[in-house]
Amino acid sequence: MHTNTGFPADFLWGGAAAANQFEGAYNVDGKGLSVQDVTPKGGFGHITDGPTPDNLKLEGIDFYHRYKDDVKLFAEMGFKVFRTSIAWSRIFPNGDETEPNEAGLQFYDDLFDELLAHNIEPLITLSHYETPLHLSKTYDGWVNRKMIDFYENYVRTVFNRYKGKVKYWLTFNEINSILHAPFMSGGISTSPDKLSQKDLYQAVHHELVASALATKIGHEIMPEAQIGCMVLAMPTYPLTSHPDDIIAVMEAERKNYFFSDVHVRGTYPGYMKRYFRENNIELDVTEEDLEILKNTVDFISFSYYMSTTETADESKRKAGAGNILGGVQNPYLEASEWGWQIDPQGLRVVLNEFWDRYQKPLFIVENGLGAIDQLEKDENGNYTVNDDYRINYLSAHLSQVKEAIKDGVDLMGYTSWGCIDLVSASTAEMKKRYDFIYVDRNNDGTGTLNRYKKKSFDWYKNVIATNGEDL
């Protein structure tokens, strides 16, 4: 009998980023505006009428002009894969055009060629919180069924353009986050306090249909390609062993499993039909929609930063006391500087839960520690960051990944989030830094944009070189 004792030989080690958080060049070479260009304080902050100087994402870290040097650094670490996104509004500036912007297409051609020249496979997210602003303002984003057609035109264009170059695709980043951040995730311009549950779940339905349609089209154009969904994953623990808390956990987890259930099984689960029925949510669902949904994904990818804890006792809930998406504080866990509770074992839990539920290959496409880094000189006079706290975080999580592989989980790869400093999604700041390469840019926008290797750079290089044996 074969036993899994460690990371497989073909394991895809790498790092991850998103176009809107690091490319910059927001109005260069014909690019249109996206929802990110009007959220200077992050996904949960206020929305401006247009781009404002305090929006760090407009310049990002200027990856658009510096990608060749950055890819060399990724290659030096030994990356097998690099996850990024295509900025939809680089390809279709408004989103509803029929003809694409050639300069935008050419940029990604050049980027993918550069990655492949360094033996790095591109892993590409089609929509990573980057809905063209015009589609948000004119159509109210994914609430409108027309979005499916616009997305179809976009994905057909990029699939045809990059077939043979990109074999790993994700349809939507953290697709379940639309329930918590409808503007950032779904381009929905209606304010959350006025957005009905019916319209919100109609937008969810449109995204699910579009995702399945992209999977169908992708397999037709690129039979060799692997197309996955991407969800925000957080295992949920009960605060107590009271049966009411156990039910609260079940209900909370279903809000997330719903998205992966549809992607993997190709149909709406019974518990969501009950939820719609009991909340008087009547969706516009056509027979054609139901047929399209049957186009299921090849693998499940997810982000993992934290677990969450649930209770049925409303008196135990305090505003801001839990993690990013609610819940209550877990008394057994420490938290990051941004209040995200750190739970390496939760990653093993979620890997096993996904595997037991679906028996589909899995891919960890985001994981990392957001922290304040201090640039200082080493003994040779070179600038670095002594980020042992980050090494400890990643080592603890990867140790649990190894345990999950021993449990029998089929895991394709791991891309740490923010392998180079970028503008954070939730708070739109530079000081919340993630992994291996420090970028000299400050929250006020000043800085040289010079790149410096952190201590974790060499640590991760060794992890990859030993295929996870040395953590």
Where are these regions (language model features)?
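Active-site region of glycoside hydrolase catalytic domains
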Residues: 1-51, 94-96, 105-471
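A common structural microfeature
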Residues: 10-12, 64, 81
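N-terminal, well-ordered alpha-helical segments
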Residues: 65, 72-75, 106-109, 113
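Catalytic domains of carbohydrate-active enzymes, especially glycoside hydrolases
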Residues: 66-87, 295, 299-300
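A short acidic, glycine/proline-enriched capping/turn motif at secondary-structure boundaries
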Residues: 80, 89-91, 129-131
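Glycine-rich, proline-tolerant flexible connector loops at the mouths of alpha/beta enzymes
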Residues: 86-100
